[in-house]
């Protein structure tokens, strides 16, 4: 770009110089000779880039063109890789979502509990997701089985922590039983399943 700017600047300056010479010379055969010389010089100036091209080492020209081609090729390759990663991520997310839907459907068909039902399921997996065997973790969020099970309880003030500990232990035991039951339904190792109870207790690996 700088070479082109320099070339155009040279042409403009040369034309201005030719105009000044033409104005200074008197109207005579000398002026005609001067115009012819100036015209020839202008042609030489305009053809300067071509002369430089012929003087340039062909390897230098080839290297310049190759670098530009490689740069454009690298940009295109990066764009293709970026799009490929986006598509793979979308496909992976879709597959995990479909697996979660199927697992929830199985649970709804076979899971039985008086107070809870399977609410939301969240899966994690490695880069490769071809089957349920590729699932690393299953987070199961339990919800009340019906509105009747959700009751408002008046606050109770107790001086000891015995009742609180008993309630916590009971919820953990309940979550453990649900974890085992879901593992049997899905035929998946219970160590992959984490059960989150509505009250905040959870059992499993996270």
From Swiss-Prot:
It comes from the Bacteria. The chain crosses the membrane at residues 1-21, 34-54. The keyword Cell membrane applies. Keywords: Cell membrane, Membrane, Sporulation, Transmembrane, Transmembrane helix. Its main location: membrane. GO terms for cellular component: plasma membrane. Pfam families: Spore_III_AF. It is found in: Cell membrane. Signal peptide: none annotated. NCBIfam families: spore_III_AF. The lineage of its organism: Bacteria, Bacillati, Bacillota, Bacilli, Bacillales. The keyword Cell membrane applies. This is Stage III sporulation protein AF. It comes from Bacillus subtilis (strain 168). One of its GO terms (biological process) is sporulation resulting in formation of a cellular spore.
């Amino acid at each position: 770009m700088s070479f082109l700017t320099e070339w155009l600047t040279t042409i403009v300056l040369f034309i201005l110089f030719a105009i000044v010479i033409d104005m200074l010379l008197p109207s005579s055969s000398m002026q005609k000779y001067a115009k012819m010389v100036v015209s020839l010089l202008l042609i030489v100036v305009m053809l300067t880039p071509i002369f430089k091209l012929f003087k340039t080492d062909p390897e230098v020209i080839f290297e310049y063109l190759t670098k530009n081609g490689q740069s454009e090729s690298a940009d295109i390759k990066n764009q293709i890789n970026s799009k490929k990663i986006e598509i793979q991520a979308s496909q992976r997310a879709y597959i995990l979502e479909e697996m979660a839907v199927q697992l929830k459907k199985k649970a709804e068909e076979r899971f039985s509990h008086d107070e809870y039902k399977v609410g939301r399921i969240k899966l994690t997996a490695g880069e490769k997701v071809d089957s349920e065997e590729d699932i690393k973790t299953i987070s199961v969020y339990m919800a009340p089985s019906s509105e009747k099970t959700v009751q408002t309880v008046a606050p109770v003030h107790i001086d000891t922590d015995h009742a609180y500990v008993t309630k916590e232990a009971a919820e953990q035991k309940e979550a453990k039983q649900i974890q085992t039951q879901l593992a049997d339904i899905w035929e998946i190792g219970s160590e992959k399943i984490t059960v989150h109870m509505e009250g905040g207790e959870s059992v499993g690996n996270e």
